[in-house]
Amino acid sequence: MQESLTSGSSASLNIHDKRFAALYELGGKITELFAKELISQSGLPWSSQEPLVVLDNACGTGAVSSVLHHTIGNDKKANWHLTCGDKSEDMLHYTRQKMLQEEWHNAEVKIVNAQDTRLPSAHFTHIFTAFAIWVCTLSAAITNLSGDLPAPSEKEIHGVYNVGWDEEASVRAKFEQAGFNDIKVRKVIKEYLVPVNQFVESCTILIPTIVNIFWTQDQRDQYESELPMAVHRYVEGKYGRDGMASMEAEAIIATGHKH
């Protein structure tokens, strides 16, 4: 589940910065919720193609590759080749760790720009691109601050990060425009529990990005420093200091074939 961000220095976010590695790790865990369904819908586990040559494009922390490794039978992995590519060296650090810990067979990790891979055409039998964009809306915490402050909804935030990839009809249209056949698109919803401390940390990491996009400079000067504590109070008040925060994760799973 890739990212389309607004332009301009105040609204820009370097999602490949080291500070966001932990946030991507959470995104990777959420991605794993849906990876089995994506892989199953692709038909790869039952593919008769030999050898399998798989690209995990924009692999992030290696969530899809990890599920692939545990899903595909040893007979198919004996002569397959798996390439994990991402633009960020920081993200690939996590993928390399997973590759070594889980002893992936015939796998390589390399820098790849998802928008311009420069990889050979018609080389791969299967290509997966799965990206998770998790954002804390902060809306409830913002409304507890004084001042008439914009409290963006989840839909408004996703309108910044996820343009064109958050509606089934739009995703289908993109696949059709790219020349895919046998297109299947469906929405899947799952629940994910996150430790409160991790939830709060992820929210506070994103505060500068959210307020830079939706608040004026005067609003940031007056209230941004108060927002981290407001987040702590709201989340701990709702879930308890040592509790688990419940998140509802939603994914659009889309597959298609090219001949």
UniProtKB/Swiss-Prot annotation:
Matching CDD domains: AdoMet_MTases
Entry keywords, A to Z = Methyltransferase, S-adenosyl-L-methionine, Transferase
Kindly summarize what the UniProt induction comment says about this protein's expression: Expression is induced by the developmental and secondary metabolism regulator veA.
**Cystines in this chain:** none
Q: What happens when the gene is disrupted?
A: Fails to produce aflavarin.
The record's listing under Pfam families reads: Methyltransf_25
Similarity comment text for this entry: Belongs to the class I-like SAM-binding methyltransferase superfamily.
Q: What is this protein called?
A: Methyltransferase afvD
